[in-house]
Every structure is written in C-alpha cells, then in structure tokens.
Amino acid sequence: MSQGKIIKVSGPLVLASGMQEANIQDICRVGDLGLIGEIIEMRRDQASIQVYEETSGLGPGEPVITTGSPLSVELGPGLISQMFDGIQRPLERFQTITASDFLVRGVQLPNLDREAKWDFVPGLSVGDAVEAGDVLGTVQETNLVEHRIMVPVGVSGRLANISAGSFTVEETVYEIEQADGSVFKGTLMQKWPVRRGRPFAQKLIPVEPLVTGQRVIDTFFPVTKGGAAAVPGPFGAGKTVVQHQVAKFANVDIVIYVGCGERGNEMTDVLNEFPELIDPTTGQSIMQRTVLIANTSNMPVAAREASIYTGITIAEYFRDMGYSVAIMADSTSRWAEALREMSGRLEEMPGDEGYPAYLGSRIAEYYERAGRVKTLGSTAREGSITAIGAVSPPGGDISEPVTQNTLRIVKVFWGLDAQLAQRRHFPAINWLSSYSLYLDEVGAYIDQHEKIAWAEKVTKAMNILQKESELQEIVRLVGLDSLSEKDRLTMNAAKMIREDYLQQNAFDDVDTYTSFKKQVALLSNILTFDAEANRALELGAYFREIMEGTVELRDRIARSKFIHEDQLGKIQALSQTIEETLHQILAQGGLDNERH
C-alpha cells in the first residue's frame, strides 16, 4: 500500500502524485472520505484515477491510499436474487445500513453478506485429488439454483479436509494440500478481478438455440446458447421490453441483468415484475435465477464502465459451474459514453464522434467473453454465456460508432424499427433488415432433435415476407387491384404472418410467451392456409371466393395465438379444418368456374 495526494479533480477523474509504488488498475481510497477509485493511467509518479463515487467536495492535498489489488468481485452464495450497483455493492443492505435512499459516499461494505449462513453439502472426500474447477460440494442457494463450490483457479492437490454444515462465506470449509507442501484454506467465496476473463478448458461451437418465447426472434433471428446479439433501435422502439422479455422467459439457468446508464424507472419495473413472474419451465419465481446490477443514469459515470465487467464476471462464474447464463446489458451505448467522457478528461486523442480510438477493442473484449465452453476441472462440464446488448444510437442512426463496432462482433442483429413501433407492431424487430448468422446451426439442431423440417418452414415464411416487400412497391404505384390473384394471396399470407404470428403482446398473460411447440403449430397453420389457398386458385377457385369463404377460418387462425399452452391440440387440429374448408370452397365454386 502506498499513499499519495490529490493534485487535481476533474469530475470523476482525480489526478494524484506520489504514487510511484502503485500499479495500473489498482483500487484506491480517495480523499478524506475514502471514495473508491481505480487507477487507469500512470505517468511517472502521477496516477489518473477514475472514481466510482460522486467527487464533489474533493480537493487538492487530500490523501490517496492504494489497496494494491485490482477491482474484483466476490463470487459465492448470496449473488442470486440480489441487486448490486456497478462495483457490486449490495444496494438493499446499503440502504438499510445508511438509512438513506441515496448512495452515501465513502461507505465500506462487503459485497456478499458476511452473516448469512449457507448449508454446504460436500461432494468429495478427504484424500481425493482435486484441480482448479473441480466441484467440491454444493449449496442450495434458491429453489432453482444449486450453487456449486469450486476449487479456485491456480489451486490443485489433495483434499486434506472438508466439512459439512452451515457456514458463512468467510469460514474455512475445506483444505487442499498442494504439491509444494503448502495448505490452501478455502471458503465458500472466491474473488476475481473483473477485467480479466475467467479461464476455461476449451471453447466450443454454439449450436443449441436460446428459446426466448418471442416468435420473431425464435423463428427468424435465433441466437444460440453461447452466442452474442445486439438490439439497436431509436428511443421508444422497445429495446428495454425486448431485453425484459428475454430475461423473463429465456431457457437458461441464470440471468444477469445489467441496467447500465438507463432510467431508474426501468430497474424499478424489473424489481416489481420479476418476483411475481413464474418461469414457464420450472414453475418458480424468475427472481430465483436472476442477478440485477443497477447503474442508473443518475449514478456516477465511472461506475457505468465497471458495471458491464462486473456483470460478465459473475456470468463467467456461473458458467464455470456448468450453467447456461444469459447476460443483458441495457444499454452498451451509455457504457460507451462513459468511456468517451473518461477519455476526454484524460485528454486522449478522440476517434470517430469523440469516442476513444480503443472503443472497438473494448466492445470486442466484452462480447468475446460470451461463448459455449468446456469448463476447467477433472469432470467434463459445459457452460455457456449468451450476451445480449441493447444499443441506443442517437436518432436511430445505426451508422454511428457504437452500433458499427458492435455489429462487427455479434452474429445476431435485432434491428428495431421506429415505423413499426409507430404502427404499434411489437416487438418492432424489422424482419427485412435484421439477421442471424446462427440460422443454419439452429435449423440443423431443431431438425435433428424435434424431427420437423423447421428450416424449410422458416425459409418459406421469410420468402413470403420478402415477396410482399417487392409487391408493396407496385401497390403504391398502381394499387392493389393491379396485382394478379396469386400475388394477392401472397400479400394476404404475408399479412397473416405479420399480424397473427410476428406481432406479440408482451402485456397479455398468454401471448407474452410462446413455447417452441406452439410456434411450430402457429406457423404451420399459416403456411398450410397459404399452400391450400394457392392450390385452390390453381384448380379454378377465385381469390374473392377464397377470401369470402375463409373469413371465420382466418379469424380462428388469428386468435389461435391466444390459446393457452396446455390446449395445444386445438391449434394443431386447425390444420385439418384449413384443408377441409378450402376443399369445400373448391368443390362449391372452383371446378364450375374452371368448366365455364
């Protein structure tokens, strides 16, 4: 530990001299209040420190003490269902201790509760050989999450002692005799620096789809477990609702939700909604698998920059246990703005639109920590992190640097469209400009595991929507009546896909989540209707007859998305009704017309 003194304060940036023994990325206690800061630049004996708390009132001459350790998170039981700020301070306990609704400066508080006791059940015996990543035992943290206590990275040897019972996160639970004769005393908790990715044995190709229950995503633009997706869009297009929906219903074990520089009301919504929502696969509250990191727009700017790293490090910890994790960052634009502000105060050469030249590498650094991996340890385990980042380009201009640097790295682009949002089409994901580079892997996985030609259905539906886009140009010029009857059927099929399938009400109890089996049934019915209608047209029926004879049928197809999951048979039975109805129309008028 070394001590220096402040020579300059510029917003969240503090310059201190006499810091020759300090290292870059060291955590410091700044000023008489002992504010938390991190060294981000060293020049001779002067250190530039970004302070994670409000710096008003700090002045030259006040002391700066380094701790000698980097910004780290505490990883152990007590993470799930908790709400932390950007540097992992527990906000609920913070409020209880300070009796204030605001972040009181200089308060030193352990990240994990030191008094809570956890029931540890050993999984190994004394004398067993262990290595980094091996699971020593488990703690049932919530009804949904079994917290696996692992051997820390860099430790291996023979298990000399292991105890069962109730322990706090600081009490010694096991001892490992290492090769050099030293004994490592382990607790339920371990620390890890946030800016360093946790190691793994091997990176694997992600193939299993992340089912979100959102039809437009799961059907046309799927993301895999271990993939990375970006959600850019203008204000009011529904980025946050898309993020919330994925956080609520994704088929993952753990969800990390990082509110980075967004409105406080959005985190309040999460806190109000999540405890009441039931996970469709387990029947438990989804809060029992969620970690919240709140760094709202009125919190210190520097902590925004740390919040993304805090979130991904916690995600890596659960990944190492063998869990599938989804991390939502809302919004990475605010994080990039924090980088821009700190870069400006450091007087660095600005890049495009004032962002630092290293913006692209920082964004890549974050998304590259996602992925499907084979974890460390003697037993084979697989874990994955799916990273989904919202991007808020000013004015919806996706040519700006944050969006462009993000799109270079991620393989899924859910482009939100202001025009769709204005037409009240939600989720407002534009099916013509969005893309997913995981379509082939997901299609092959579903065809193999579900034994249905899913990729073929998706291609057919997308072709109909693309054809509609081409026909709309003609309709605008010369009107709908100028189209051939076949083209008018295509326009009708596209309308059904858009309104009866892609459009989804996040606030309707049934429509908010659609299981994969229900998605297959809904899309199959629309495609069956289109195929049978085209067949009837070829055999002599008129477009007008088909439309007039299927009013009630089309209404039933439209309403089928509001049928409950446990009544899936009703949707599947509709396929037979579609065929019968169109055969009937053909029998009544089609063949007569052909004769005449």
UniProtKB/Swiss-Prot annotation:
Produces ATP from ADP in the presence of a proton gradient across the membrane. The V-type alpha chain is a catalytic subunit. GO terms for molecular function: ATP binding; proton-transporting ATP synthase activity, rotational mechanism; proton-transporting ATPase activity, rotational mechanism. This is V-type ATP synthase alpha chain. It comes from Streptococcus sanguinis (strain SK36). One of its GO terms (biological process) is proton motive force-driven plasma membrane ATP synthesis. InterPro entries: ATP-synt_VA_C, ATP-synth_a_Xtn, ATP_synth_asu-like_sf, ATPase_F1/V1/A1_a/bsu_N, ATPase_F1/V1/A1_a/bsu_N_sf, ATPase_F1/V1/A1_a/bsu_nucl-bd, ATPase_F1/V1_b/a_C, P-loop_NTPase. Belongs to the ATPase alpha/beta chains family. The lineage of its organism: Bacteria, Bacillati, Bacillota, Bacilli, Lactobacillales. It is an enzyme of class 7 (translocase). Pfam families: ATP-synt_ab, ATP-synt_ab_N, ATP-synt_ab_Xtn, ATP-synt_VA_C. Coiled coil: none annotated.
